[in-house]
UniProtKB/Swiss-Prot annotation:
The keyword Cell membrane applies. It comes from Mycobacterium sp. (strain KMS). F-type ATPases have 2 components, CF(1) - the catalytic core - and CF(0) - the membrane proton channel. CF(1) has five subunits: alpha(3), beta(3), gamma(1), delta(1), epsilon(1). CF(0) has three main subunits: a, b and c. Its main location: membrane. This is ATP synthase epsilon chain. The keyword Transferase does not apply. Pfam families: ATP-synt_DE_N. The lineage of its organism: Bacteria, Bacillati, Actinomycetota, Actinomycetes, Mycobacteriales.
């Protein structure tokens, strides 16, 4: 099966780089799934996005993403995020607390983190 080269990079660090069979996320135009050999595009991610990376023979990788862009070429996907956290790095209680914040940016970050944990859609 064909693979995508996927790079997820936040302002402060590289989050993940590797091979995937499918990438799913939410953009300002709606939800999108990327398979190998997808048409090229550039899309803006929503502020409370979750990126799901499906990998052959491995568990899905879930990343909470706070804003940024996605670039798709025939061979791969690059996610350039303002903030990003792997599911394994997220504290559920803190994410829930943040999602209820009066500050819109903090609330969006909390929702993205809860999506990565699979606790909200």
């Amino acid at each position: 099966m064909a693979d995508l080269d996927v790079d997820i990079v936040a302002v402060e660090r590289e989050i993940w780089s590797g091979k995937a069979t499918f990438v799913f996320t939410r953009t300002t135009s709606g939800e999108i799934g990327i398979l190998p050999r997808h048409i090229p595009l550039v899309a803006q991610l929503v502020d409370d996005a979750m990126v799901r990376v499906e990998r052959e023979g491995e568990e899905d990788l879930r990343v909470a993403v706070g804003g940024g862009f996605m670039s798709v070429t025939e061979s791969g996907v690059i996610i350039l995020a303002e903030t990003a956290e792997l599911e394994s790095e997220i504290n559920a209680d803190e994410a829930r607390r943040d999602s209820e914040s009066d500050d819109p940016a903090t609330a969006a970050r909390g929702r993205a983190r809860l999506r990565a944990l699979g606790q909200i859609d």
